[in-house]
């Protein structure tokens, strides 16, 4: 029987082996961490939205006393006035009280919807400025929105009762569309159609309720009939489509919002997202909606910004705008849609 002789490692060799073991372990840990971070959504408390804390004293950010005044400063008072003039060039002269009331209604409904929408989306910015709830807090912002809408409903009912039915019905439709969008976000795709044509139709119906009803409301208030419904619906669809496309195709818009592909990261459907679900690699879009990890979002954006999906969106924009150029000139939103798949 032979005896195996082992030579103890020198102190230097032991130190080198320990260092090598630590290095390999550290590298393995880095790889595991990278894979985990890349494949799983960040905890909500780690996200920028939860690190951003609004000013304790809103006066240090703005001299305005409430969220509604703040967002109204961003968009301007009576920002629907050009549309009112186009619908009824003589209304301001013929019935100045109604003219002013229509503009107050449109400001209140439109801007208050934005206040609540920014809370729902967790948006940090609105047109390059801090979102109202980042300054005043979500509770005060939401309550002020409800308060202002209630004021408008009361003023319309008492001062312009013939306009109240139009306002109530269209506001109900707007909120139905918004509710449908939020339910899709909550439940994921299990209650969303699977056929491509049905998906596009379902999304357009939601947009017609949420955005279309806002534009149709303007025609109803000014003209007190439905004669402009088709035109207003088309203008609204273009507006929704343009906003959807800016969210994923515009560097300018991303800078103003402080986020890239905010809809996708929030699990919210948009027209490019709906189209991309049926494109090659569309499974990444569905994965990103379910779990917006960096890896899933990155691959989903590659599908959304693919030439095929981008071209379909641009074609829909061109088709929907062809007969309403005079109205779009009043809308005046022209961010460049310059982001495509690399």
Curated annotation (Swiss-Prot):
<feature type="transmembrane region" description="Helical">
    <location>
        <begin position="17"/>
        <end position="37"/>
    </location>
</feature>
<comment type="pathway">
    <text>Secondary metabolite biosynthesis.</text>
</comment>
<keyword id="KW-0472">Membrane</keyword>
<dbReference type="Pfam" id="PF00348">
    <property type="entry name" value="polyprenyl_synt"/>
</dbReference>
<keyword id="KW-0460">Magnesium</keyword>
<keyword id="KW-0812">Transmembrane</keyword>
<dbReference type="GO" id="GO:0043386">
    <property type="term" value="P:mycotoxin biosynthetic process"/>
</dbReference>
<feature type="binding site">
    <location>
        <position position="117"/>
    </location>
    <ligand>
        <name>Mg(2+) 1</name>
    </ligand>
</feature>
<keyword id="KW-0479">Metal-binding</keyword>
<dbReference type="InterPro" id="IPR000092">
    <property type="entry name" value="Polyprenyl_synt"/>
</dbReference>
<feature type="glycosylation site" description="N-linked (GlcNAc...) asparagine">
    <location>
        <position position="154"/>
    </location>
</feature>
<dbReference type="InterPro" id="IPR008949">
    <property type="entry name" value="Isoprenoid_synthase_dom_sf"/>
</dbReference>
<keyword id="KW-0325">Glycoprotein</keyword>
<dbReference type="GO" id="GO:0046872">
    <property type="term" value="F:metal ion binding"/>
</dbReference>
<feature type="binding site">
    <location>
        <position position="121"/>
    </location>
    <ligand>
        <name>Mg(2+) 1</name>
    </ligand>
</feature>
<dbReference type="GO" id="GO:0004659">
    <property type="term" value="F:prenyltransferase activity"/>
</dbReference>
<dbReference type="GO" id="GO:0046165">
    <property type="term" value="P:alcohol biosynthetic process"/>
</dbReference>
<feature type="binding site">
    <location>
        <position position="117"/>
    </location>
    <ligand>
        <name>Mg(2+) 2</name>
    </ligand>
</feature>
<comment type="function">
    <text>Prenyl transferase; part of the gene cluster that mediates the biosynthesis of the indole diterpenes penitrems. The geranylgeranyl diphosphate (GGPP) synthase penG catalyzes the first step in penitrem biosynthesis via conversion of farnesyl pyrophosphate and isopentyl pyrophosphate into geranylgeranyl pyrophosphate (GGPP). Condensation of indole-3-glycerol phosphate with GGPP by the prenyl transferase penC then forms 3-geranylgeranylindole (3-GGI).</text>
</comment>
<keyword id="KW-1133">Transmembrane helix</keyword>
<feature type="binding site">
    <location>
        <position position="210"/>
    </location>
    <ligand>
        <name>dimethylallyl diphosphate</name>
    </ligand>
</feature>
<dbReference type="GO" id="GO:0008299">
    <property type="term" value="P:isoprenoid biosynthetic process"/>
</dbReference>
<feature type="binding site">
    <location>
        <position position="126"/>
    </location>
    <ligand>
        <name>dimethylallyl diphosphate</name>
    </ligand>
</feature>
<feature type="binding site">
    <location>
        <position position="121"/>
    </location>
    <ligand>
        <name>Mg(2+) 2</name>
    </ligand>
</feature>
<comment type="similarity">
    <text>Belongs to the FPP/GGPP synthase family.</text>
</comment>
<feature type="binding site">
    <location>
        <position position="110"/>
    </location>
    <ligand>
        <name>isopentenyl diphosphate</name>
    </ligand>
</feature>
<protein>
    <recommendedName>
        <fullName>Prenyl transferase penC</fullName>
        <ecNumber>2.5.1.-</ecNumber>
    </recommendedName>
</protein>
<keyword id="KW-0808">Transferase</keyword>
<dbReference type="GO" id="GO:0016020">
    <property type="term" value="C:membrane"/>
</dbReference>
């Amino acid at each position: 029987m032979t005896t195996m002789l082992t030579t103890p490692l020198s102190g230097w060799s032991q130190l080198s082996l320990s260092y090598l073991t630590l290095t390999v372990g550290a590298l393995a840990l880095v790889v595991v961490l990278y894979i985990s971070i890349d494949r799983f959504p960040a905890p909500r408390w780690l996200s920028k939205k939860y690190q951003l804390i609004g000013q304790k004293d809103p006066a240090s950010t703005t001299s305005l006393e409430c969220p509604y005044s703040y967002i109204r400063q961003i968009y301007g008072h009576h920002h629907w006035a050009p549309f009112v003039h186009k619908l009824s060039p003589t209304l301001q002269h013929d019935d100045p009280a109604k003219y002013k009331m229509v503009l107050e209604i449109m400001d209140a409904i439109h801007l208050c919807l934005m206040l609540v929408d920014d809370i729902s989306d967790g948006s940090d910015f609105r047109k390059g400025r801090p979102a109202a709830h980042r300054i005043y807090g979500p509770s005060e912002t939401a309550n002020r929105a409800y308060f202002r809408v209630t004021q408008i409903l009361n003023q319309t009912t008492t001062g312009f009762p013939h306009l109240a039915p139009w306002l109530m019905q269209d506001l109900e439709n707007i909120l139905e569309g918004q509710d449908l969008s939020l339910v899709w976000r909550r439940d994921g795709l299990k209650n969303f159609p699977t056929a491509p044509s049905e998906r596009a139709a379902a999304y357009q119906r939601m947009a017609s309720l949420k955005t279309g009803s806002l534009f149709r409301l303007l025609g109803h208030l000014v003209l007190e009939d439905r004669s402009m419904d088709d035109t207003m619906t088309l203008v609204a669809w273009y507006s929704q489509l343009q906003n959807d496309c800016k969210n994923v195709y515009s560097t300018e818009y991303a800078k103003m919002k402080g986020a890239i592909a905010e809809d996708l990261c929030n699990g919210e459907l948009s027209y490019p997202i709906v189209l991309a679900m049926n494109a090659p690699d569309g499974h990444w879009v569905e994965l990103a909606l379910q779990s917006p990890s960096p890896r899933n979002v990155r691959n989903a954006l590659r599908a959304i910004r693919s030439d095929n999906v981008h071209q379909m969106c641009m074609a829909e924009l061109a088709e929907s705008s062809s007969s309403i150029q005079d109205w779009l000139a009043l809308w005046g939103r022209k961010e460049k849609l310059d982001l495509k798949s690399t």
